[in-house]
Amino acid sequence: MHHPLPPDDTLYDQVRPILWTGHFLKLLDQRKLPFVVEYVECHSSEDVTQAIRTLIVRGAPAIGIVAGWGAVLAAREIEAVDGIEALCKLEPALQRLHAARPTAVNLAWVLARMRRTLSAAHADWRQVMECEAESIAREDLTANRCMGAYGAALIPIGSGVLTHCNTGSLATAGFGTALGVIRDGIAQGRIARVFVGETRPWLQGARLTVWELQQDGIDATLIADSAAAHLMKSGQVQWVIVGADRICANGDTANKIGTYQLAITARHHGVKFMVVASAATVDMDTVAGEAIEIEQRDPEELLGVSGVRTVAEGIAAWNPVFDVTPGALIDAIVTERGVIQSPDAAQMRATFGN
């Protein structure tokens, strides 16, 4: 398949949240954005596990990439004559990394890839692991640029778009998935208006996405999550563009909580709905969305904003982090392998196998 070349990503891609120094990992602390730009150093796999669990790093692709470097750091703590022995000794650390955020399939995919690489490695297994982690990050950036071009091509000139959560450079190796499509659409003059939902309770849209777009000089308008239906009714939005943490064999898609209601609202108003994610996010072993484990986080996250409590004491809260959008509500799934319009199990199988 021909891969169209997107515009120069250096114009609209200024943020890098993951920095490997050759000795340790530096992660942009996304809990403190937009007011504090601070990097956290990870010197061990346990540091990386904690960074994933506590949302220093977030976004399915970024979590996977960071887990790869976590495996590299774990390798610094053991001795082994070859990859097979190393794999046996590293398995507990790999399992801890996997347990840090269970919903995102990229995390499991990267760790499985590191296991395969190790099992074939010889005495140079440490170097092989580091090369593999570098390849994973490089491939993600290449895939994002490709997806940006594919997705932007679907958007008519002069369109308005709405996005949810953060799917840009902060959530990936760079450029972004859904936000990469928006960057490309802006560069091509296809997108005239960008709206961003605030994305409670962690406010990834309000804290991260509008800040990231601001770094690139892209104007964006923030809305309350509850304003999305009214916005769509006004006719200012032609596409909703979101990322994914897991895409099932039938096109059902797990993504940040609130995505499902956007898809329902978009269908009612005749607004198109696009999911953008790398092929690594596709899980052909999971038949449908009902089988996806939905992460539940501490209800305390819902009881305040930025550490300031806004709810009376003694109030219960329900805090699922993801929901599942049925494939039937999705107009297009965009990966680096191309576009699947009106996705179903047959089309998914034709593109991704199984």
Curated annotation (Swiss-Prot):
Known catalytic reactions: 5-(methylsulfanyl)-alpha-D-ribose 1-phosphate = 5-(methylsulfanyl)-D-ribulose 1-phosphate
Site (Transition state stabilizer): 165
EC number in record: 5.3.1.23
GO biological process, one term: L-methionine salvage from methylthioadenosine
InterPro entries per the UniProt record, alphabetical: IF-2B-related, IF-M1Pi, IF_2B-like_C, Initiation_fac_2B_a/b/d, M1Pi_N, NagB/RpiA_transferase-like
GO MF term list: S-methyl-5-thioribose-1-phosphate isomerase activity
Residues reported in the UniProt entry to bind substrate: 58-60, 101, 204, 255-256
Protein's pathway: Amino-acid biosynthesis; L-methionine biosynthesis via salvage pathway; L-methionine from S-methyl-5-thio-alpha-D-ribose 1-phosphate: step 1/6
Keywords: Amino-acid biosynthesis, Isomerase, Methionine biosynthesis
UniProt xrefs under Pfam families: IF-2B (PF01008)
Residues annotated as catalytic: 245
Class in the EC hierarchy, top level: isomerase
Function: Catalyzes the interconversion of methylthioribose-1-phosphate (MTR-1-P) into methylthioribulose-1-phosphate (MTRu-1-P).
HAMAP family registered for this protein in UniProt: Salvage_MtnA
Family in the record: Belongs to the eIF-2B alpha/beta/delta subunits family. MtnA subfamily.
Protein name (Swiss-Prot/TrEMBL): Methylthioribose-1-phosphate isomerase
Species whose genome carries this gene: Xylella fastidiosa (strain Temecula1 / ATCC 700964)
